[in-house]
Amino acid sequence: YITFAFPDAGTFYWGAAFSVPKGAKLHLEGSFPHARYMSLISYDRLGAPLDSVADYLIAPKPGASNPYLFGADRNSKQRGYKIEVVSEPLSTPIPWGVYQEAKTRDKIHAPGQAENGQQQLIYRIYAGDKNTDETAGSGLPTPVLTLADGKELRGQDVCASLSSFQPLSFDQAALATPREYLNKLTEVAKARGGPAMPASNPPTWSKSSESMSRYAIYTGDNTVASGTNKKDGTFFANLDNQYVRTFINRKHGEVFVIRAKAPTTPKTYNGNTKFEDGDLRYWSWCSQQGYASGRVNKCLFDEQIPVDANGYY
């Protein structure tokens, strides 16, 4: 399990770097996984999301059903889907962290990078049902390539035609903050608040965003560029997520305790039969090593965290 760019340990990620030949068409044939959430998201070389198609937006194949719709049968046997991967950029940006009412998608836009034409997708599965494998019992989507002359390719022929073994092209800053810059930020933070900074007591929470506001917890500058106040624009972020971070330090004490009211979410881990509504689709707590590495230590997601009779944990 590769751990960089702040992953959630309750999630499995599969990445693809490829180049669709001129005039060809690519689509994916898959089966909806037995899980809390799945999505396909395309990215640029800076790790910023370009387009996202979440599970509930995907139209199932004729005769199949989408188990991610409210009230749907999560254990339906017929759960296939097909989605086209197009090379053109998306004309209208996807709303960040917003449930899209009454929409369906049969395409995901994955434009090539200006530098080398490489296209990038990440397939995510959050909180697979208990006793399922890494794909939550669904297998991985199958790529199907139709060449300009109409010939259809599958299997290894697709991989060769897509140059799918090409190295991933990305800016290193998409995975973690460069060490030299982070050292400067730490010096600024300690000058502001002492040797435990950027940790504070009580903790200071910051919303991750594009622009320098991501580092407000170091600098104290909470200025957010126009249009980015709801975004987390790099580190291969998920367009359906919002991220809030803080730092802790044992200079403030041996134990850090969090008490809060838990948002409601669908219950899925034990193979629940119906897909329920909730305040959120999913939430989790993650312990990470900070901006220097982007690595995760451990996470707990909602169904793993005990709550009391009043919904507090």
Each predicted region: which residue ranges?
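A compositional/structural signature for long, glycine/proline-rich flexible linkers
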Residues: 1-313
